[in-house]
Each structure stands twice: as C-alpha cells, then as structure tokens.
C-alpha cells in the first residue's frame, strides 16, 4: 500500500511539473493541419479525421475486450482451475488476421483517392508560378514571370492557384506549410512541384520538415496571402528598387555594407549588388521577420542578428564578421531603409502582430521580438 502511495505521488509530481513547463512556454505560432486554408489541406484534414475515427473505434473494441478479460479474471481469481486457452485456435487466428486487413483495405480506398486528387492533377494554367529553393537554413523565392526575388516570405493573392517549383541547393529539405498543403521533400538534383489555392487572407507559418543540419528547427517560412488588390500593389512595389537612404546613419551603413563584404553574398536591387549566395535583401525592411522567420523584423533584432549570427542560428553559412555595436547599428539602419516603395506590407496583413518566440538555440525572445539583455550578455560571453 505504501509503495502504491509513493508511485501515485510521483505521478502527480511529474504531471504537475510537466503542466508547469508547458504553461511557462511562450505563445508560439503553431500551424495546425486542422485549421485548413486551402482545398488541398481540406483533403488531408478529411482523411485525418477518417483514420482517427477508425483508430478510436479499434481502440474502443480492444479496451472493451481487455476490460472484460480483467473483470472476468478478478471474478475467478479464487478458482484454481486453468482458464480456457486460445493458443492454436485456428478460427481466432484467422479472425484477428483478416479483420485488420479489412480495416486497412477500407482505409486504403480513401487514402489513394485523396492522393490522386492532390497529386493527380496539373496546376491550372492561370497559376502563379514561384521557384522555391531550400538552402541551409533559409528559403529562396523567385517569381520568374514577374522578375521578383525574395526570401523566406512567400506572397500570394487569395483565391489564385499557386504552383511551386521546388528544389534543394545543398542537402535534403522538406517544404511544409500545414494549413495549405502537405509536405514535399526536396532532394538535391531533383525537381519537385506542388500547387495549392489559398482560400483566405493572413499569414500562414511553415517549416522545413526534414532534418538538414544544426539549425533545421530554425528554417522557417511564412506564406503571406493578400487580397488581389494588395497583391497587385505588392508586385508593382517589389519590381522597383528601394529609395536611396537619406539619413546619415543609414548612408554610413550602406558604405559598411560594401566595406564589410556583405555585398559579396547578398543582392540589393538598384545598387551594384547582384550576388545571391545568401538571401536577396532588396526589400528586407518590409519583411515581417528576419533570419528565416526566427525573429520579428525590428532594428534591435537586426543588430543582434548581425553581431551574433552564428549564436542565434548555429551552423548558418553567414560568417560572424565581428561587427562592433556601432557598425551593426549603422548597417541595420541601412537595411531598414530597404523597403517596398509606396506599399506597407505589414499594414496589408490582416491580424498580424508581435509574436513570442524561442529559437532553437534556447535564447528567448520577448513580446516585441527582442532578445533579453541577459541573453545578449550570454551571447557576448559565448564569443
């Protein structure tokens, strides 16, 4: 009796600690396959509920038989005779082999039907075409028919089919935005494609779903779905370069951008920066996030990203340039000026606000998206 009490107390303690840990976690944007935003996701959700229903039914039957056996055993626990044995019972063995096969066959039909509906049709001719390349640890987005190049944020109009031509630039990745489509693996040397039609406006969060290195968990992306009018305005703005910086601090940052070698890896539309080893920064000032969806796009976060790149995102190809606080402030001020001309993307997004995040390095981000001063000191110590 004493042993049972100890085990019960330990169980309560574990549950309490687990609940406390969950309560202490910040509110993360958690995409769900059940909160569908496209016909493709609806097919997957319907199949999920069908399989879940069968699973619950099977579980209920198994638990019912187990309960009956336990109750029967308790009633007969004072009897010495051996209970009936089923070993070698051919009828029972055939039954518990055939019944699961029947259940699997029943589930196979809607599964194959859903796969055919999702992958058996070509994208409509009016589909928006975007080339997506997964790289450690970010996403390159190219609109070939529009001449637009961006990174980590896929912008599309509501109600229009979107065809994604998927490829990997280094190792295996998997493209996944749960609310609009299933996973598609990206294998080096292979071209893949998928398409979907977003049904509502908003921001939908995605993630690389294939372990691809140290910062796999930090390889995020966002699908920004706009109204047709806002999308047309975004296209017109994205096809134009950002205005030259007028502020003295930003102008100094533009010079440092060249002097520190940033120009060797990053393209900026309208200036002599065409290399695309890293993300295109032409309109980074208008994006909702930086570091592939890890941090909200604020000047404070940009400064910390520039100074502590390899600490915020371990394994990233971007080198730590050893920038001083003043140098990082100037470059961040310059990057902040690289905005979409005459278009405010954040204002066009419905219901988008500051999110709480914890990056995979373990450094928490507060409500404004800025790392705490304690964590900054920790990062400086790591260097």
Predicted feature residues:
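Seven-transmembrane alpha-helical bundle of G-protein-coupled receptors
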Residues: 58-62
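A short, flexible beta-alpha/helix-coil linker loop
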Residues: 286-290
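N-terminal membrane topogenic signal
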Residues: 1-12
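Non-transmembrane, membrane-proximal soluble domains of secreted or membrane proteins
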Residues: 2-3, 20-50, 63, 70-276, ...
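Globin-like tetrapyrrole-binding proteins
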Residues: 55
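Core hydrophobic alpha-helical transmembrane segments of single-pass membrane proteins
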Residues: 12-21
């Amino acid at each position: 009796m004493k042993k049972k009490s100890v085990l019960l107390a330990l169980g309560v303690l574990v549950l309490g600690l687990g609940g406390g840990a969950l309560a202490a976690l910040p509110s993360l944007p958690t995409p769900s396959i059940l909160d569908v935003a496209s016909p493709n996701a609806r097919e997957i959700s319907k199949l999920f509920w069908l399989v879940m229903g069968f699973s619950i039914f099977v579980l209920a039957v198994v638990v019912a038989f187990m309960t009956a056996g336990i109750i029967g055993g308790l009633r007969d626990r004072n009897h010495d005779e051996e209970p009936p044995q089923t070993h070698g019972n051919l009828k029972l063995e055939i039954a518990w082999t055939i019944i699961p096969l029947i259940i699997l066959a029943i589930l196979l039909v809607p599964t194959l039907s859903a796969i055919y509906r999702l992958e058996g049709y070509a994208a409509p001719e009016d589909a928006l075409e975007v080339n997506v390349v997964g790289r450690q640890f970010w996403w390159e987005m190219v609109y070939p028919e529009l001449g637009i190049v961006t990174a980590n944020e896929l912008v599309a109009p509501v109600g229009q089919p979107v065809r994604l031509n998927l490829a990997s630039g280094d190792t295996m990745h998997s493209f996944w935005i749960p609310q609009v489509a299933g996973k598609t693996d990206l294998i080096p040397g292979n071209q893949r494609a998928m398409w979907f039609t977003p049904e509502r406006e908003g921001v939908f969060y995605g993630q690389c779903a294939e372990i691809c290195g140290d910062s796999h968990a930090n390889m995020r992306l966002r699908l920004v779905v706009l109204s047709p009018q806002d999308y047309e305005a975004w296209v017109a703005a994205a096809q134009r370069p950002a205005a030259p910086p007028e502020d003295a601090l930003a102008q100094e940052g533009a010079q440092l951008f060249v002097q520190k070698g940033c120009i060797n890896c990053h393209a900026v539309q309208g200036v002599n920066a065409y290399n695309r080893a890293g993300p295109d920064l032409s309109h980074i000032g208008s994006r909702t996030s930086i570091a592939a969806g890890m941090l909200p796009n604020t000047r404070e976060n940009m400064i910390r990203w520039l100074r502590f790149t390899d600490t915020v995102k371990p394994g990233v190809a971007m080198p730590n340039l050893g920038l001083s606080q003043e140098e990082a402030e100037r470059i961040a001020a310059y990057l902040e000026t690289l905005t979409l001309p005459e278009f405010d993307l954040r204002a066009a997004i419905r219901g988008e606000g500051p999110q709480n995040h914890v990056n995979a390095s373990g450094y928490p981000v507060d409500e404004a998206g800025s790392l705490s001063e304690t964590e900054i000191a920790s990062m400086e110590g790591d260097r």
